[in-house]
């Protein structure tokens, strides 16, 4: 199943996780660099107010729901129960189901902490994944130098975790120069992924309450994203 719904007048692609996994494996097997945006409420708000930015994000091959809050008017619980992509955590499902397990990933992040957490998360999702490199992005960084650094590693997957707005503009501006097969942007919703990397306190572990703790952490992350 692959359809779309209007959220704040933006077309959001809707598909099952099975279809998503199939598409990602297809993207990783062709020679074109495909761009996947996991959308946040902030991204959609910005696109509503800035036509030029809207034109930028509409260049993406897929705009997927990056957080469940986007689908609050579309019975998100039913969609999730039906195996639909409802947040950026489906990227983890994709990594788990890579046809070629030793794909390489290069990470561009906002901070060294987030880069390290994303590296840990990616390897947990797919132990066979090769971490080809990473960089903490600086707006003053020379674009040509960064692009050369990425291209020297020729990653299969370019995972981008930057601020909403600059992230999408940077990707689309430099898309023709990048040597990768798949670019996945998660900057506006990365907290949903990083929440899974927060280790439970010792007292929680002793009481064997890790699943409940992880659920509460995820819910708190969603609330923060909605309030933002």
What do these predicted ranges mean?
Residues 53-59, 168-190:
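A short, gly/pro- and small-residue-rich
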Residues 1-83:
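N-terminal nucleotide/polyanion-binding subdomain common to many enzyme families
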Residues 150, 154-164, 180:
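Proline-aspartate-enriched helix->loop->beta-strand connector
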Residues 36-38, 64, 157-161, 184:
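Structural motif
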């Amino acid at each position: 199943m692959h359809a779309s719904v209007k959220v704040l007048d933006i077309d959001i692609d809707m598909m099952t996780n099975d279809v998503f996994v199939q598409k990602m494996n297809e993207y990783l097997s062709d020679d074109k660099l495909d761009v996947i945006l996991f959308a946040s409420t902030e991204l959609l708000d910005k696109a509503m107010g800035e036509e030029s930015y809207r034109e930028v994000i509409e260049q993406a091959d897929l705009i997927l729901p990056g957080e469940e809050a986007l689908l609050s008017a579309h019975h998100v619980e039913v969609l999730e129960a039906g195996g639909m992509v409802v947040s950026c955590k489906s990227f983890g499902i994709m990594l788990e189901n890579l046809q070629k397990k030793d794909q390489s990933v290069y990470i561009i992040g906002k901070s060294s902490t987030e880069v390290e957490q994303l590296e840990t998360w990616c390897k947990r999702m797919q132990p066979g994944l090769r971490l080809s490199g990473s960089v903490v992005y600086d707006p003053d960084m020379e674009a040509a130098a960064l692009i050369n650094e990425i291209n020297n590693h020729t990653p299969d997957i370019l995972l981008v975790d930057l601020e909403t707005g600059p992230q999408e503009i940077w990707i689309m501006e430099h898309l023709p120069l990048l040597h990768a097969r798949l670019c996945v942007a998660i900057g506006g919703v990365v907290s949903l992924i990083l929440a899974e990397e927060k280790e439970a306190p010792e007292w929680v572990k002793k009481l064997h309450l890790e699943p409940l703790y992880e659920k509460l952490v995820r819910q708190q992350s969603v609330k923060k994203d909605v309030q933002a």
